[in-house]
Amino acid sequence: MKLFSLASQPFLVTLCLSLLLISCAQTPVQAEVKLDAQFEKQVLEVIRKNPEVVLESLRAYQQQEQLKAQQAQKTGFQKFKTDPKAAIGQSPTYGNGKLLLVEFSDFQCPYCASARINLKTFVDRYPDRVKLIYKHFPLTQIHSEALPAAKAAWAAQQQGKFWDYHNALFDQQKTLNDETYGAIAKTLNLDIAKFNRDRTSPQATRAIEADQKLGESLGIEGTPFMVFNGEPLSGAVPVAELEKRLTSAK
């Protein structure tokens, strides 16, 4: 005879989750918790005789957590719309509009290179309606030059040449290296000594990390990723789609 029927699912779930949570505890205080032997035996028996209920309960729990994460993500996206000053921060901007188009990008990402063209075309068409904000999101696990390139672009920003440097990096994406960063800086007539100091400074590191942490807090995992007027977009979004979003923007 089963210890519990399916009708007793809430109690069953409590027992199962109690065992799972306590058995997975890692802190010293939690490690000292000892389960009553009979209670543990009951829970294990429940799991053995009612695996379908356990799986169903875990699936329901995962769905609840996903919904919570999605809601938190949506709230984060909306903050770009409700608090534009905070969204911009110290990031470089392009265009003078009130509708914010926040881009998370990686200079070594080929899809970001395609997105760059679409975004420039779009903002150039609607400069009084849209403002593009660039956020660094170097995918360092797969792009070895993404972080050095981001720091070089940040250094160029300190001399008012971010977008020119940004465009040059994407134009030379296949040959990104230290020599390239210096050559672009010379072409743009930057103060080379200052440029080199800035790109290797703690301030550059902190600025890039701040953008990365912001992206991670929003659940962003890849690039290019955009938030236009509080709504997420991913990939090299076509100009036509951006215009469609602009038409419906409030």
Regions found by a protein language model. Give the residues of each.
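Cysteine-centric redox/oxidoreductase cores and disulfide-bonded domains
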Residues: 139-250
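Secretory-pathway extracellular proteins and peptide precursors enriched for disulfide-bonded cysteines
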Residues: 15-16, 101, 186
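N-terminal cationic amphipathic segment used for targeting or macromolecule association
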Residues: 5, 23, 27-29, 183
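Bacterial N-terminal signal peptides
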Residues: 12-23
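Bacterial N-terminal signal peptides that target proteins for export
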Residues: 2-14
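Extracytoplasmic thiol/disulfide redox context detector
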Residues: 24-141, 200, 208-217, 222, ...
